[in-house]
Every structure is written in C-alpha cells, then in structure tokens.
Amino acid sequence: CQSRREVNPGDDGVAISRVVETAASWDGAPLPSYPRGAPRVTILRATVPPHTALAMHTHALVNAGVILRGELTVIAETGAQRMFRAGEGIVELVGTRHYGENRGDGELELVMFYAGTQGMSLSERADL
C-alpha cells in the first residue's frame, strides 16, 4: 500500500490557476444577487456537435463554465457576441435572451456550474 502525501495548494506538484473571477457576465452586465431559499448547485457537462446552434434561452440564475474542447460563440438578442476557446471561462448572461453556437468543425465540450435554489429552472427557452 502506498502512503498518501498531503499537500496544500501551491506546494510542489500542485498547480492552481484562476480561470475567471468577476461580478459581471461576459457582456459586462452586473450579476444579480443570489436568490433566497434552499441552495441548489448543478454542474452539467455538455457536448455540442460541429456547426450546431442551441435554442434561444434565458437564465434566471448565475451560471458559469469552462470550455474543455472546441469553441463556443454566444450571441445575445442585442447582437453582441463573444467567442470562448478551450481553457477559457464563461460567465453567462442572466435575464438576457441569448444562444450558443459551435461554429467550428470539431465537437464543443464544456462544463457549466449553476448556483440557484430548489425549484429554480436552469434555463427557459425564449423563442423569438
């Protein structure tokens, strides 16, 4: 049996990097306060095929993620858009209609983290 060596962040062999820290979504809008109620954290891993757009939708809760592979372009109803590449963090729009699109030739893979309360929907479809 191998013995376990305990280390602290920053010790030899442990690398930590801040992907994103902000109080605003990717378009610069301030994030809302967290809702009151029993907390619920959800983490989703998504894979999006090449040349695929997700449906227009909104979020009522703060959510953020990391692009693991590929590129994600997010387009807001205002026309503002931004591309996120592998390794980059994204802080989503809250209360603004938007959609994501994989415009690349390879799969897009990302992990999203949602911070809400029991009973809150992660997103709502928002057709034009």
What are these regions (language model features)?
Residues 1-42, 83, 125-128:
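A short, N-terminal "cap"/entry segment at the start of jelly-roll beta-barrel domains
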Residues 46-52, 60, 69, 96-99:
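N-terminal post-signal-peptidase region of extra-cytosolic proteins
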Residues 59-78, 88:
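Glycine- and acidic-residue-biased ligand/ion/polar-headgroup-sensing regions
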